[in-house]
A protein has these predicted regions:
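Charged, amphipathic alpha-helical linker segments immediately N-terminal to NTP-binding catalytic cores
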Residues: 1-28
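Globular "head" domains of long coiled-coil molecular machines
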Residues: 12-15, 34-38, 42-318
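Charge-rich, solvent-exposed alpha-helical interaction surfaces
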Residues: 13-20, 36, 327, 331
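Charged, low-complexity interaction regions
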Residues: 25-32, 351
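Hydrophobic face of amphipathic alpha-helices
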Residues: 239-242, 347, 362
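C-terminal helical "lid" subdomain and adjoining coupling/linker elements of P-loop NTPases
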Residues: 286-295, 309-353
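A non-catalytic, extended alpha-helical scaffold characteristic of dynamin-superfamily P-loop GTPases
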Residues: 351-362
Length: 362
């Protein structure tokens, strides 16, 4: 009871602050700020924890998420695949929306479309790809997709947000990803086996403005030559890369993992018969014993255990509130920056200030 009263007090204070900010003249005229404040108030009501999954196209984001879900449902490739923001909701196994997807379109007046992702998997995957089989530009056609699945061993109301790649070629990909990060509470940052590139560093500095909790994951450890560089050694090297390049050597990262998303997925989804293309060409199907070994070799359980433990703990609740307060502070900082800019313009040329800034003098 005490916890509920305390949370309600915090909720009331955040809503009151949001209402006061919404009355500021600079905010009243901005659709962007009004939408942000609406999102914050909605977050107060629902308190759904959101995790963005970010990385280059080649980092294996969709394969990773498929492994987490346990089914090969999201399209995955080394080129531009995730064309739209995809929200993956954790729902109970008996929920009427389980294994369903709702497609939201950009075209005004066009109704949402609900798809059974098991029975109509090809249609579902078409809506997530940059171009579907008819050559339609999905980026322009689809606004977002909500997917409802059950994550085993996770009872929390969690949403994983699959974002377009950092090296996206579609217009607005990067802006869309930044927007989603600003609305989320933590991020899983996926890197290809080569490690952290300059694009990753630039993006991470932007990301750290909005969030505090990061799971750093180097994928594709199955491609390593064990004689030249064992997975354990590569993971230690990657942890040093994160510490020195992202945190400038000042912070020891808490969550760093090396995985094979591919082996984890093949180990879990019994509908997949082959690990690599050459296995398919040779007609050699995976045995149950091999599937079990692939899952163990993937090191996926280490990441999953840490992630689910974090998502089930109190730290998650604090992160939700921190995120809302950061968003409010960002709006206030922007308003203050605009005020200072106008003040400097006024000081430079007081007589002409109203005319230059579209202000009436009578």
């Amino acid at each position: 009871m005490t916890r509920k009263i305390k949370d309600q007090n915090i909720d009331d204070k955040i809503i009151n602050l949001a209402n006061r900010i919404s009355e500021l003249e600079s905010v009243k005229d901005s659709e962007f700020y009004k939408n942000q404040l609406t999102n914050i108030k909605s977050e107060i009501r629902h308190k759904v924890f959101r995790i963005t999954v970010v990385g280059e196209f080649s980092s294996g984001k969709s394969t990773f998420l498929n492994a987490l879900i346990g089914k090969d449902i999201l399209p995955h490739a080394v080129s531009e695949t995730t064309a739209t923001i995809t929200y993956i909701h954790n729902v109970p196994a008996d929920d009427k929306m389980e294994n369903k997807a709702v497609v939201h379109f950009n075209e005004q007046g066009r109704k949402d479309e609900t798809i059974d992702i098991v029975k109509d998997s090809q249609k579902f995957q078409d809506y997530l790809s940059a171009l579907n089989k008819n050559g339609d530009n999905i980026v322009k056609l689809v606004q977002s997709v909500d997917v409802y699945v059950n994550f085993t061993d996770l009872d929390e109301p969690i949403v994983f947000v699959d974002t377009p790649g950092l090296n996206g070629v579609a217009d607005g990909h990067r802006d869309i990803t930044i927007r989603e990060i600003s609305r989320s509470h933590a991020s899983i940052c996926l890197f290809p086996i080569r490690g952290i590139g300059q694009t990753d560093l630039t993006f991470m500095r932007e990301l750290m403005k909005y969030q505090n909790t990061f799971f750093f994951v180097i994928n594709q450890i199955d491609t390593l030559n064990r004689q030249e560089e064992p997975p354990e050694e590569r993971i230690l090297t990657f942890k040093e890369e994160v510490k020195n390049n992202i945190y400038n050597g000042t912070i020891e990262p808490e969550y760093v993992f090396g995985i094979s998303g591919l082996k984890a997925l093949v180990g879990r989804d019994k509908q997949i018969d082959y690990l690599y293309m050459e296995d398919k060409e040779n007609g050699r199907r995976i045995t149950d014993e091999e599937r079990k070994q692939y899952l163990e070799d993937s090191r996926f359980a280490l990441l999953e255990d840490a992630l689910f433990k974090y998502l089930s703990g109190n730290e998650k609740d604090r992160e939700i509130y921190d995120s809302m307060i950061r968003s409010l502070q960002t709006i206030l900082d922007d308003v203050e920056s605009q005020r200072r800019e106008l003040l400097e313009i006024y000081k430079a040329d007081p007589p002409n200030f109203p005319k230059k800034n579209g202000l009436r003098t009578n």
